[in-house]
UniProtKB/Swiss-Prot annotation:
Pfam families: LacI, Peripla_BP_1. The gene is purR. Consists of two structural and functional domains: an N-terminal DNA-binding domain, approximately the first 60 residues, and a larger C-terminal domain, approximately 280 residues, which imparts the function of corepressor binding and oligomerization. One of its GO terms (biological process) is purine nucleotide biosynthetic process. Keywords: DNA-binding, Purine biosynthesis, Repressor, Transcription, Transcription regulation. Homodimer. Residues 2-56 form the HTH lacI-type domain. Hypoxanthine binds at residues 73, 188, 219, 273. The lineage of its organism: Bacteria, Pseudomonadati, Pseudomonadota, Gammaproteobacteria, Pasteurellales. NCBIfam families: PRK10703.1. Residues 4-23, 48-56 bind DNA. InterPro entries: HTH_LacI, Lambda_DNA-bd_dom_sf, Peripla_BP/Lac1_sug-bd_dom, Peripla_BP_I, Tscrpt_reg_HTH_PurR. This is HTH-type transcriptional repressor PurR.
Amino acid sequence: MATIKDVAKLAGVSTTTVSHVINKTRFVAEDTSKAVWDAIQQLNYSPSAVARSLKVNTTKSIGMIITTSEAPYFAEIVLAVEEHCYQQGYSLFLCNTQNEPEKIQNHLDMLIKKRVDGVLVMCSEYTRDSLELFNGTNIPMVVMDWGKADDHSDRILDNSFEGGYLATQHLIENGHKDIGVIAGHLSKTLSKERYEGFLKAMHEANLPVRQEWIYEGDFEPESGFEQMNNLLRLEKLPTAIFCFSDTIALGAISALSEKGLSVPSDMSIIGYDNIHSSRFYSPPLTTIHQSKSRLGVKALNILLERIKIDKTQYQPQTIEFHPELVLRRSVRNLNK
């Protein structure tokens, strides 16, 4: 395997010059630079990424910690981040916590050892101790969506409260007064805010919130299926259900279908996230849209900005996105 000394010998220059050409850390004459690159190509020399990172104090790599990359919502964000990393010349280390808090420390330790230039966090499992340890490394961090507030990190917020309010308000405007909820974990910030938005819209319309119509699970379709079946055992049913994710809505619609009930004739359903497949549900799902690609790209751009500037002069920022209602065919208008 060729070494930097072999390249220097073939190009007729010093190893220091080869290093400057590779890392672009000093001006090198065009003819000399060409000789070095010709030698690199001829010898099939591959510089050590670790050695280069020590020279230029960058690894051109980003870490991303998320709850799970399998869920459609997260998958769409990861895809956008990965593509933008590629366009900017960065590699991406993807770490899934799978809702297991103990994994967060192992992932953070690994990313520190990999000397990543920055980290995107999109999970709610990390602890204050973990953050303090990570902040001690001075590695820039951007917290996306689900994350807790932190004085050292930028935050990208999806405004789940506003989204929960919009979803419920749409049901009310379509004449629904008996409205239920199938939520994700209400201990999670995202679910809690959507539920608070639901409550605000209900209270403004002077509509009662019936606790027997409030169901809590996770964000998977199996949870939507199970909780809808639990709801259907009740004597009195709501006319509409606000599902806290499109995947929950998928399970809920499936449960209704198995009971011979149709959406929206027998029960209206509104989802949240506007994942790619939601337009192909039967019926196409009315939902709350938040641009996953825009969220991912914005978070990465902020992180890259932090990486490039003096950390002592940077003030963490909070950026909010505003959700939008996407009208399809899963909500019945009872006013007609």
